């Protein structure tokens, strides 16, 4: 029973982290589409702040034993690749 609860908490933690990563991607996409260009200091500040916050969330979940360190790094790497692709698409417009 306890192991089932732990697995459930791990799944929920990873799902919440993925939701936060998706929110960051959407926030940056809206910002690029409507507000600022990637070279703008505001864009860079928002991106840096959001990525730092997510990395701290992941670190916290890893320290609690809810998320594997490799899985957390994978999530950050995936988000960075998606943001890079979004940036490339925007600059090619």
Swiss-Prot record:
Signal peptide: none annotated. Gene3D superfamilies: SO2669-like. Pfam families: DUF1507. Belongs to the UPF0358 family. This is UPF0358 protein BPUM_1375.
